[in-house]
Amino acid sequence: MITPDEAELCYPHLGNYSCRRIVRPHSVYVLLYIILSSISVLTVTLNLLVIIAISHFKKLHSPTNFLLLSLAVSDFCVGFIFIFDILLLDNCWYLSAGWCMFHVVLSIIVPTASTGSIVLISIDRYIAVCDPLHYPTKVTVNRANISVVLCWFCSALYTLGLLENIKHPGGFNSCIGECMPLMHPVVIILDIFLTLIFPAIVIIILYVRVFVVAVSQARAMLSHVAVVKLQGSVKVNKSELKAARVLGVVVVVFLLCYTPAYLVSSLYGTLSTFYFVKCLYYFNSLLNPMIYVFFYPWFRKCVKYILSLQILKSGSSQHTVKRESC
């Protein structure tokens, strides 16, 4: 018969070698599983729609949209990572040490690549708004694709060098049933700087510059300073500024969702608190495609086209879609 103390262990038959589990009422577990599973499914589904839309429709094959595709891929992966975190609701890991390491590595590579994609998108918008005449030559599809590949490669390389227990899965666990990354305190501080503080500074500086240019252009248009010859470029800048505003919303949501998780992890908060902010951290991946749905008519049009299975028709990739940068 299992005693109350043994009921709080992940592996009761191992006694003190087992990690302690978080005991919650059954109704709370059911509610959490339903909510978190729904978030996971929605995250995977919505980001899959973004991936299909940009990949399938050739009219959307622009440098900015390929950077957005990278962000959607990372958000899509987050939906699967979330499944592992649902398994950790009671603070117990019941899968093998190899799967634990896979989860840990993926949970660092994907958010790091997501942050890198956000930075690349910010740079893209900065060049498009602040240097529109040279944008077509500076930012090409090939350069965007190379940037995306380098972003993911550096994220993987960074993650492999970050973890101390990568070569010995489960060898440094304090108890059986634990699945946590092992990092030196100095490395944790360095990680916070490289994956949050530094990217946030770069993003904020770029968007402040974009905002200043947007305001100056608006004033110039209102005071009729713009020369007639520049009307064409001003029209282009309007669409670029619209894209910059939408991506500005993406960046703000990104910072609001990611900052609490990094602050709590650096301060070694309690597990329950950390789990809440970790969910907020992953919830950002669900919000991104929802932002596109609300702000971009072309995305809603693509979704209808995909869900009606019209993309299976011959020549559907050439379907006319309003070509806007995301």
Map each language-model feature to its residues:
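Seventh transmembrane helix
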Residues: 202-203, 253-266, 276-326
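Extracellular N-terminal segment of 7TM GPCRs
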Residues: 1-45
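Helix-to-loop junction signature of class
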Residues: 36, 53, 77-92, 104, ...
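Juxtamembrane loop-transmembrane helix junctions in multi-pass integral membrane proteins
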Residues: 20-34, 56-62, 66, 95-101, ...
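Alpha-helical transmembrane segments of multi-pass membrane proteins
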Residues: 40, 70-79, 112, 147-159, ...
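Intracellular effector-coupling site of seven-transmembrane GPCRs
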Residues: 212-261
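Extracellular TM2-ECL1-early TM3 structural module of rhodopsin-like
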Residues: 22-37, 63-123, 128-138
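Loop architecture of class A 7-transmembrane GPCRs
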Residues: 11-23, 92-108, 137-145, 152-204
